[in-house]
Amino acid sequence: MGLVIFVAGRYLLWPPQPPVSSTPATAPGETPVTVSPTTRPASEPDATASSVSTKYGGILRLADRGDPPSAFDPMRTSSIALHEVAGALFGPGNLVMRSRENVYQVSPYLARTWYSSPDFTEWTFVLRNDVLWHDGTPFTAEDVKFWFDLALFGYEVDGKIRAPAYFKGELDAIEEVEVLSKDQVRIKLNTRNRFFLEILADPRLKFAHPRHLMEPRLKAGNVSVSPLDIGLVGLGPFRFEKYEEGSVVRVRRFDRYFETDGQGNQLPYLDGIDYIIMTEPAAMDAAFRTGRLDGGARGVGHYLSEERMQGYIRDLGDRVFFAEMEGGNFRLAFNVLKPGPWQDPRVRRAIALWIDKEAAIPSVLGGFGWTSPGLGPLNPGKDKRFVVWPRFDTAPLEERRAEAKRLMAEAGYAEGFVMGHISRAQQPLGGQFLKDQLKGLGIDLQLEVVDEAEWNTGRVSLDYDSQQGALTVLPIPEGTEGVYGRFSKSPDSYAKHEDTKVDDYYRLLLEASTTERRIEVWRQLQEYIFVGQTYVIPIAEAIYVVPYRTYVKGLPVPAEDAHTHTDFATVWLDKSVK
């Protein structure tokens, strides 16, 4: 696995890699309507002549950037501090998952096959019959219905209310989940959606709520019951063993896990994983370089900068490799539901024109990022025609800033104003960059630096004037309503608005029958959000870099979205490599 480094205006691969053959990927959304494989080969990017027996065993030691928040509940947070652990406990997907071989394709997971109605408004899933919860209870269609109902509608008993999942907006088209038999469920949608599988394959949507353990507690009035309260009983390749707050999360192999590799050998290979909680990136770097870690943490702040990566290369040479993934977008988003000058679209537009986007790459993204898709890392599976935002606002910075000043004066704010901004303590560089940038426009950006607990609740509230957002956009346009949609449908959306025209664009996307029409509508939608209304200002695309020891083998590295493939079921430790 190589690393793409931005040097002298272009990207270079380090270390140099031999040519690798690849199978052309199908376009997102072009998966067959009916799929019925019984096995799925595990990713083996580091195949050797080692016998299968040598792959088994060992404890993988990974850094985690913080304690998993929200009592380990994936319905309450998308934090990577949870989801780096959640993949091992709860699995890499739900009914379906992103393929380990190609993140843009959908593979079976808990469902072994599925089919849709001709108009894509009904999807029927046939479940595997060999899936067990970690306490030995069989997984059934009743678990599926329970999870979807809990995520979509929450729960109410004796006047106590449990809120729906934060990602409800992604699944808002679901009208009903019907149990057909012990191993079959039918999901009915209120609109056609031939991309429903790709949306469902979002790795944040994890089954962490076993009906047989959760439902009795809910009926008894404990509407806040969490996965931690019931012992973190999941469906993933590893079972929960121990959690010491501020120290470590330990998981160990679940011997009755259902997945096998391409040769029929049971997964996972590892005996277990220890997630060492390290809130300081410097502590992680020191632990890795002194042999106390096998892999770094995922998460902004802990991803390597160019300077930190050079330290790894200097000290470890060929004993380290770097997993590189396209990350999320560094952005500024507005709460237009809160009174203030930012409710005027001219003001928001002025801010978008004023920001020097390229300056964010070294200042905020550690040197790894891009503002033009032509400069991004090689990614043959991604259709760059859907990468629209860099094509807006391409005039020279001086011209853009002159127009920004004019718009501010026209809106009556030539002297500027004060605007609040919720900023994560774990990643202060973004907030400081925005504050420094907007000072020249006369805007005093008041940074409200918060811990992870307040960040996870504050960003889904209407309490703050602006924010950077947290979620990584799904790889397909149809899966982005959860981050660009209306607040009432998607509380974790970047901007807080109630613009029904955005709903109309997503409806047109779902109705599109050709790739060309999808691209056309997607461009119109992005132009509306980023330019016409400027609810969100995309600034630069991040490239996430995570270090691993070279003896870590079988690691599927997603082309984008670091929440993907955190189950580590196919990972093994090559004992012949020191």
Regions found by a protein language model. Give the residues of each.
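Extracytoplasmic/peripheral linker and loop segments enriched in polar/acidic and small residues
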Residues: 340, 349, 361-364, 395-398, ...
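N-terminal lobe/hinge region of extracytoplasmic solute-binding protein
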Residues: 45-47, 59-118, 149, 231-235
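Long beta-strand-rich cores associated with HINT superfamily self-processing modules
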Residues: 548-578
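Extracellular/periplasmic solute-recognition and catalytic clefts
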Residues: 157-160, 164, 241-252, 276-338, ...
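Surface-exposed binding/hinge segments that line
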Residues: 55, 126, 164-217, 239-244
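Gly/Pro-rich hinge or "lid" segments in bacterial periplasmic/extracellular proteins
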Residues: 97-101, 201-274, 280-283, 401-402, ...
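Structural transition elements
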Residues: 44, 238, 368-410, 427-429
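Periplasmic-binding protein-like
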Residues: 325, 341-383, 429-430, 528-538
